[in-house]
Amino acid sequence: MSEPSAKKQKFANSLEALKATGTTVVADTGDFESIAKFTPQDATTNPSLILAAAKQQAYAKLIDSAVQYGKKQGQNIDEQVEIAVDKLLVEFGTAILKVVPGRVSTEVDARLSFDKDATVKKALEIIKLYEAEGISKDRVLIKIASTWEGIQAAQELEKEHDIHVNLTLLFSFAQAVAAAEANVTLISPFVGRILDWYKASTGETYTAETDPGVISVKSIYNYYKKHGYNTIVMGASFRNVGEIKALAGVDFLTISPKLLDELLSSDEPVAKILDPESAKAEGSERVSFINDEPKFRFELNEDAMATEKLSEGIRKFSADIVTLFDLIKAKIQA
């Protein structure tokens, strides 16, 4: 049904064709100098992306500025480092917001993933730093891992503080349901990392249509539309453009510069695959997790892929934030 409409209009490239399906394109990078040509609406960052960008000479001034700020504000070395790292994340976000017209996602320290109160506290500190830069909280999404504690923190931030949250490292239907019930602004269901797990565990080869990560996002999208949830579904973590095209029409897609480049240099058509009306007919029946921690934990535990990938993701982001802390600490002590 949507295939012919994709061909009626000729677009300059596949990226423009993707945007024409109704999907909002988001740049997944901390390297803000590389994203303007893609004209994304928003940008997402994480500790790994910031760490990669921080190692580039082009961003040395941001690091120096954050280090000086940390030295002034902190009472001891540990405080100075923590403040400087928060400041650095916000400096990257502020610079990105000069390039994108929408919002930037800034991640809370992944080591707080199992501490609701500490997550809320850190989110408020990050927003305060943005506001000191003249950035309204409406232009910031606080990224939090989709643990039980993270989802509860997100609910509190949205309800009590009117702070927008992006729940990340989302691999399971239970996480997605609880996130919608928490009324969060946006979720980031991961596609490529789900595919990685299934390829490793089954040894099978998947097409874009049979890709377990693509199927996961479709089922979440259909469920949200069927039950009238306003939470934005933003597919994330892609291994190839086939996965991206298979989700054309979904609310948002956050895409790495490498894959954005591929779309920009291709003139292949992109057909709209997902739409709200069809989704309403295909979504599964309503279930609930938000007030039932044992049920949530059991459902997550039953999903080996989601359990392993959530743990692995938190470990990876935690390791990268520690590396970033060490980098900043060395500069403060130099």
UniProtKB/Swiss-Prot annotation:
This protein's UniProt keywords: Acetylation, Pentose shunt, Schiff base, Transferase
- Sequence positions bearing N-acetylserine: 2
Pathway(s) of this molecule:
Carbohydrate degradation; pentose phosphate pathway; D-glyceraldehyde 3-phosphate and beta-D-fructose 6-phosphate from D-ribose 5-phosphate and D-xylulose 5-phosphate (non-oxidative stage): step 2/3
Question: One GO cellular component from the entry?
Answer: cytoplasm
What SUPFAM superfamilies does this protein map onto?
A: Aldolase
EC number(s) given by UniProt: 2.2.1.2
Q: Which residues form the active site?
A: 143 (schiff-base intermediate with substrate)
Q: What InterPro entries has UniProt attached to this entry?
A: Aldolase_TIM, TAL/FSA, Transaldolase_1, Transaldolase_AS
Cite the GO molecular-function annotations of the record: transaldolase activity
Q: Which domain of life is it from?
A: Eukaryota
**Catalysis: reaction(s):** D-sedoheptulose 7-phosphate + D-glyceraldehyde 3-phosphate = D-erythrose 4-phosphate + beta-D-fructose 6-phosphate
Assigned protein family: Belongs to the transaldolase family. Type 1 subfamily.
Q: Which HAMAP family match?
A: Transaldolase_1 (MF_00492)
Q: How does it assemble?
A: Homodimer.
Q: What is this protein called?
A: Transaldolase
What is the name of the gene encoding this protein?
A: TAL1
